[in-house]
Amino acid sequence: MYIILMRHGEAVPQTEDITNRERGLTPKGMRQVRRSSRILARFLKENPIRIFTSPYVRTRQTAGILAEECFAEEIHTADELLQPNWQMVRNHILQEGSPIALVSHHPFLQSYLLTTCSAAVKFDLAGIAVIDYDLKWNQGKLIGYFTSGLRQLKKED
């Protein structure tokens, strides 16, 4: 199964009136997410995905755009995505079936990637890592990394 790890796009700064949890995407952040999501949609070739997102506003907005572009079956908010504990995510979220996308924050995504496939990338804003994951063996292989700056995805024949 595919596990898609996605970081939110650029968010408004935290202020006295806007808490970290309430920070939404900027217009630029929305464009970043849409571009990355469209690249992912071409990669997935119309396979529907299930989306799980952290409860923060910027990740929920990111998940909404991802759902529009990538044939999402459903979006779930998951507090588990606010912690770097892959085993908890695996036990509460993962199941056989269609690909799933986990929309979260930079340090947690890096931790999940390192734990699942011993790979490390710096997650850019709206960056997406695609893991081919084997639930039985509890391990995966990083097979793709996309950013909003990528203009075209070379298709395999």
Segments predicted by a language model, with ranges:
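Active-site-proximal alpha-helix that buttresses catalytic centers in soluble enzyme cores
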Residues: 2-78, 109, 119-126, 157
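Domain-level recognition of soluble alpha/beta enzyme cores
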Residues: 117-143, 148-153
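Short alpha-helix plus adjacent loop in nuclease-associated cores
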Residues: 82-93
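Conserved beta-strand termini and adjacent loop/short-helix elements that scaffold enzyme active sites
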Residues: 78-80, 145
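Non-DNA-binding regulatory cores of transcription-related proteins
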Residues: 95-101, 106-126
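Glycine-rich phosphate-binding loop signature in dinucleotide/nucleotide-binding domains
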Residues: 43-46, 94-98
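Short aromatic-enriched loop/helix-cap "lid" or pocket-rim segments at secondary-structure transitions
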Residues: 16-18, 89, 142-143, 154-157
